UniProtKB/Swiss-Prot annotation:
Stretches assigned to the Protein kinase domain: 621-882
Spans through the membrane: 541-564
Keywords: ATP-binding, Cell membrane, Glycoprotein, Kinase, Membrane, Nucleotide-binding, Phosphoprotein, Receptor, Repeat, Signal, Transferase, Transmembrane, Transmembrane helix, Tyrosine-protein kinase
Lineage: Eukaryota, Metazoa, Chordata, Craniata, Vertebrata
Topology in membrane: Single-pass type I membrane protein
Protein name: Ephrin type-A receptor 3
Length: 983
């Protein structure tokens, strides 16, 4: 054979394929790419007549350089080709990609003893380019390279191109650079291209945090990289990700929030445009300026009000700017002697606000001064003078026959900010002539056997000129059946013609031009006996003496009472405080600590709903479709569009028509609970609708639904790191609930919702009502029904629910996640589950479950609740596993498992199986029965020896049935070992 013709054929076979090379991924950094080098490669060939450098063009007529070797006729070939020195930059792990063609030795005549179909790849590390001469012993072998496809002479004739691509790893390397070498031992091979590269995690932006180009350190662990927030943002939680050895970013934690005045656009925080604003940090869009406000700058925190429009300190930035109201209208006065009722109409313009109130200014006009002056403090306004919310007021205790002016101001929340003149309506009135007020005190100045001298003061409110006084008197024993009236012009009178030693009753009233006033209260005075007469002077002395004696007695009593109360107060003060603390509102709030408040402690459940849940307008909610049915009504998906906010997807629970008050209270009870929580791993309550029908609870929408069904649908499709990330989110949410003092009681994968970003959130806080209709709560105790498969032993036996019982339930959720949604305890009855757990049996580890995670399950299932981990500890454990993923590669060893594990399908009678079909049906894998028909695995004895590779060969390629069959085989092996041996 012509040795110089064969290289040309090899080159032709290779160049046609070189142009169809795919673009390299973005996480690969080339250290060498022979296709990109212009001119000769200049690699060293040893011996010099071995490898030969050939020039050519690809299908795009781009020049490329290749090396080939085709000395297949001679024995003991040892032809070496060494590259130039390649700097490694920052890489520790190097990848070598070879593209080559190789001739099938069978297609070359007379070379069966000398022709080879492989070649060898070597490397040597060096800190500099000093290797002038080739020394074979200095190189370390990487691998022997063989072709997946080799070509023949017929392929060349048909122009069938067979280009091989092989990639090998080198490293870790530590020196500054290295050489590659290729050893030919007798193959007909053409080296079309050599690409040397390393992998990096490329620069990326995640959750508004920038992560730089990162090169993996080694092949065993992830590199934790701290992100930096993009411009105009700040950390909410320190952002970090992990760089894998494959150059992939994993497990994003934390995020950044755009500053006030900036919104998230793409992967950056961009300034709000003119006409838009954002008042606080957060990843929400800038809002359009509300009515009567504007902004002309970028990055506005709020919008400035137009001229004569204002925003009060209590108004949120999203509220429209408003102005003071116009004046009240149509004032009407209704005068009744010394009182007046004022009525008016609402202003035509309320200024755009609902907090309009009215103030009354009263002015007294006329008299000696021609200027009006403020009314005296004696004038009263009913119900009050300022802050009126209704359009009527009654003014009493005015002076009779007096001119008054009343100014009615209309004000609202921004009136104090305006410099414009007051907006008021005025009305002037004159009060009528009125009766005088009653005389309050009548004094006895002198008595005799047949007369009494009386005096009094003018009425406090004469309401005009007093014309005279009417004095009415009669004997007390006559009971007003016969009385006498006399009139006096002054404020004193002497009444004569009375009987000695007789008690008389006196009443006096004043008269003005209007009429008589009301009579005074009744005063009783007694005339003197026949032989006794007291002057007014002596009478005063006697009265002073009596008054002094009475005062001393009263003072003694008061001092005694005060001393007793002071002592009693000191004794009871502590106890009173304790009662106040204990019986306040059914709960105690400590300063600086947010605690859960049980809505059932409220006498009025509606108060709890209004306190913790936001009332939504039903017009802002649109329902798209019904996605399910709940206990009280339908569950829908829809959209919520609040004013000045972006439309969001929501889940909507509705209360069906014809509900009872108890059903409504139970329905809204869950909202009262949810509304108290604010955590990224707790389902967020958007609000409730209670003022219209149907009554609704609106929450954030979780695209992937419940975690258990999601995992069953995506069986074996996630990495362990992704599953641990989900579990970490659940644990973080439960830590938050535990810190608030809330016990969930129904923690299960079916009550965990998962969104499109694989973020898990704890939901379903209506245990007290839901469990009554939950099919998983078929075991009844004294207090109702509880989900047996997820509930701790002490909660089942004593209904003792604590955060420790939630930790037990978390262990079951952990088992559900790692088994991709399998049902805990499978088909065991509730009584069998209770008995097995009480006897110390625990669930076995799921298939391929990391030992660290199964140990965490067992810790959560400690019988003594005090030995179970707290959720804070669980979060810490999962964080450590995420930071050190190599620890998750240790799978639970079947031989090292505890002996007290429950077997899957433990209630199946294995002895009843006679054929493989019976066995597969018994373990719920009957769909595989047809595959095993007619093959060597047709009996139980042979099928018990099947491996995962064997299953793939016969067609069982789906992971779910594979897992069930493997679990069934373990059960069959256990049964076989424990079965008696026939004799």
């Amino acid at each position: 054979m012509d040795r110089r013709r064969l290289p040309l054929l090899l080159l032709c076979a290779a160049l046609g394929s070189a142009g169809r090379l795919s673009a390299r991924p973005g996480n690969e950094v080339n250290l060498l790419d022979s296709k990109t080098i212009q001119g000769e490669l200049g690699w060293i060939s040893y011996p010099s007549h071995g490898w030969e450098e050939i020039s050519g063009v690809d299908e795009h007529y781009t020049p490329i350089r290749t090396y080939q070797e085709s000395n297949v006729m001679d024995h003991s070939q040892n032809n070496w080709l060494r590259t130039n020195w390649i700097p490694r930059n920052s890489a520790q792990k190097i990848y070598v990609e070879l593209k080559f063609t190789l001739r099938d030795c069978n297609s070359i005549p007379l070379v069966l003893g000398t022709c080879k179909e492989t070649f060898n790849l070597y490397y040597m590390e060096s800190d500099d380019d000093h290797l002038a001469k080739f020394r074979e012993h200095q190189f370390t072998k990487i691998d022997t390279i063989a072709a997946d496809e080799s070509f023949t002479q017929m392929d060349l004739g048909d122009r069938i191109l067979k280009l091989n691509t092989e990639v090998r790893e080198v490293g870790p390397v530590s020196k500054k650079g290295f050489y590659l070498a290729f050893q030919d031992v007798g193959a007909c091979v053409a080296l079309v291209s050599v690409r040397v590269y390393f992998k990096k995690c490329p620069f990326t932006v995640k959750n508004l945090a920038m992560f730089p180009d990162t090169v993996p350190m080694d092949s065993q662990s992830l590199v934790e990289v701290r992100g930096s927030c993009v411009n105009h943002s700040k950390e909410e939680e320190p952002p970090k990700m992990y760089c894998s050895t494959e150059g992939e970013w994993l497990v994003p934690i934390g995020k950044c929030l755009c500053n006030a005045g900036y919104e998230e656009r793409g992967f950056a925080c961009q300034a709000c445009r003119p006409g838009f604003y954002k008042a606080s940090a957060g990843n929400v869009k800038c809002a359009k300026c509300p009515p009567h406000s504007s902004t002309y700058e970028d990055a506005s925190l709020n919008c400035r009000c137009e001229k004569n429009y204002f925003r009060s300190e209590k108004d949120p930035p999203s509220m429209a700017c408003t102005r003071p109201p116009s004046a009240p209208r149509n004032v009407i006065s209704n005068i009744n002697e010394t009182s007046v009722i004022l009525d008016w109409s609402w202003p035509l313009d309320t200024g755009g606000r609902k907090d309009v109130t009215f103030n009354i200014i009263c002015k007294k006009c006329g008299g000696s001064s021609k200027i009006c002056e403020p009314c005296s403090d004696n004038v009263r306004f009913l119900p009050r003078q300022t802050g009126l919310t209704n359009t009527t007021v009654t003014v009493v205790d005015l002076l009779a026959h007096t001119n008054y002016t009343f100014e009615i101001d209309a004000v609202n929340g921004v009136s104090d900010l305006s410099t414009l003149s007051r907006q008021f309506a005025a009305v002037s009135i004159t009060t009528n002539q009125a009766a005088p007020s009653p005389i309050t005190v009548i004094r006895k100045d002198r008595t005799s056997r047949n007369s009494v001298s009386l005096s009094w003061q003018e009425p406090e409110h004469p309401n005009g000129i007093i014309l005279d006084y009417e004095v009415k008197y009669y004997e007390k024993q006559e009971q007003e059946t016969s009385y006498t009236i006399l009139r006096a012009k002054s404020t004193n009178v002497t009444i004569s013609g009375l009987k000695p030693d007789t008690t008389y009753v006196f009443q006096i009233r004043a008269r003005t031009a209007a009429r008589y006033g009301t009579s005074s209260r009744k005063f009783e005075f007694e005339t003197s006996p026949d032989s006794f007469s007291i002057s007014s002077e002596n009478s005063q002395v006697v009265m002073i003496a009596i008054s002094a004696a009475v005062a001393i007695i009263l003072l003694t009593v008061v001092v005694y009472v005060l001393i007793g109360r002071f002592c009693g107060y000191k004794k009871s003060k502590h106890g009173t405080d304790e009662k106040r603390l204990h019986f306040g509102n059914g709960h105690l709030k400590l300063p600086g600590l947010r605690t859960y408040v049980d809505p059932h402690t409220y006498e009025d459940p509606n108060q709890a709903v209004h306190e913790f849940a936001k009332e939504l307008d039903a017009s802002n909610i649109s329902i798209d479709k019904v996605v399910g049915a709940g206990e009280f009504g339908e569950v829908c998906s829809g959209r919520l569009k609040l004013p000045s906010k972006k439309e969001i997807s929501v889940a909507i629970k509705t209360l069906k028509a014809g509900y009872t008050e108890k059903q409504r209270r139970d329905f809204l009870g869950e909202a009262s609970i949810m509304g108290q929580f604010d955590h990224p791993n707790i389902i967020r309550l958007e609000g409730v609708v209670t003022k219209s029908k149907p009554v609704m609870i609106v929450t954030e929408y979780m695209e992937n639904g419940s975690l258990d069904s999601f995992l069953r649908k995506h069986d074996a499709q996630f990495t362990v790191i992704q599953l641990v990330g989900m579990l970490r989110g659940i644990a973080s949410g439960m830590k938050y609930l535990s810190d608030m003092g809330y016990v969930h009681r129904d923690l299960a994968a079916r009550n965990i919702l998962i969104n499109s970003n694989l973020v898990c959130k704890v939901s379903d806080f209506g245990l007290s009502r839901v469990l009554e209709d939950d099919p998983e709560a078929a075991y009844t105790t004294r207090g109702g029904k509880i989900p047996i498969r997820w509930t701790s032993p002490e909660a089942i036996a004593y209904r003792k629910f604590t955060s420790a019982s939630d930790a037990w339930s978390y262990g079951i959720v952990l088992w559900e996640v790692m088994s991709y949604g399998e049902r805990p305890y499978w088909e065991m009855s509730f009584q069998d589950v209770i008995k097995a757990v009480d006897e110390g049996y625990r669930l076995p580890p799921p298939m391929d479950c990391p030992a660290a995670l199964y140990q965490l399950m067992l810790d959560c299932w400690q019988k003594d609740r005090n030995n179970r981990p707290k959720f804070e500890q669980i979060v810490s454990i999962l964080d450590k596993l995420i930071r050190n993923p190599s620890s998750l590669k240790i799978i639970t060893n079947a031989a090292a498992r505890p002996s007290n594990l429950l077997l899957d399908q433990s209630n199946i009678d294995i002895s009843a199986f006679r054929t493989a079909g019976d066995w597969l049906n018994g373990f719920r894998t009957g769909q595989c029965k047809g595959i095993f028909t007619g093959v060597e695995y047709s009996s139980c004895d042979t099928i018990a020896k099947i491996s995962t590779d064997d299953m793939k060969k016969v067609g069982v390629t789906v992971v779910g049935p594979q897992k069930k069959i493997v679990s069934s085989i373990k059960t069959l092996e256990t049964h076989t070992k424990n079965s008696p041996v026939p004799v």
